[in-house]
């Protein structure tokens, strides 16, 4: 508990009495409950859904995990949208969160959602916001694919996967993906199946501004934040109740939020909301036909 408190209070965390600690935990739990009820009438360009496994407080269901949603506003600012808990890989848990956001004002579907491929988040998103595009995290997908390969093959395969998501345009990415399939299908069909299963969702970023690709190909921008939160909160598992635990996690995420950097070229977000279509990272009206690109 001391480690987590030090992030929030600094040196003042040392030597706090049990009574003061109890009051702080109660205040944070109350602040979290109030935050969860706030109106949220914003337009979101991006929505990042992540679930973080931890050891729940004593007496809680061991399948419980922390569910977090980060958003990118029309101004290009990253902000904390939702913090809750729910069952691992549960569509119902995520759907409850998304329905709650709708009820509090997030009626317009976000333009794109980003996450790994193992969550009930996607099934819930299909029901709550069917218009929202979907982008699978390349870091998580790469790790899952490499797990199906012998260690001796992993370095070469990782480089081949990187050629896909680093391709300058969708056509080149599709070609690189086809090469990977041809090279690994016969010996490692499970690895190839994991890649092809989310083929469209892995390449969705090509329909967004090129300046945003670094933000939307993976969930990396927020991973370090939650690695710290998970580490700190896991070590408090025997010290707090569920409400105190959520309050503590919420306060730590709020603290981290102050250091988040907005996305590059935020003016392109306004273009997206204005209905401008992007092809291979460039506005469609500025994109050359395929034959002219080849000639160039």
UniProtKB/Swiss-Prot annotation:
UniProt-listed InterPro entries: Transposase_mutator
Q: Which UniProt keywords apply?
A: DNA recombination, DNA-binding, Transposable element, Transposition
Pfam families in the record = Transposase_mut
Keyword set includes DNA-binding:
yes
DNA-binding: present as a keyword of the record? yes
What does the record give under GO molecular function? DNA binding; transposase activity
Q: Which family does it belong to?
A: Belongs to the transposase mutator family.
The organism's place on the tree of life at top rank: Bacteria
Which GO biological process categories is it annotated with?
DNA transposition
Q: NCBIfam families from the entry?
A: transpos_IS256
**Where does the secretion signal sit in this chain?**
none
Q: What is this protein called?
A: Transposase for insertion sequence element IST2
According to its UniProt entry, the function of this protein is described as: Required for the transposition of the insertion element.
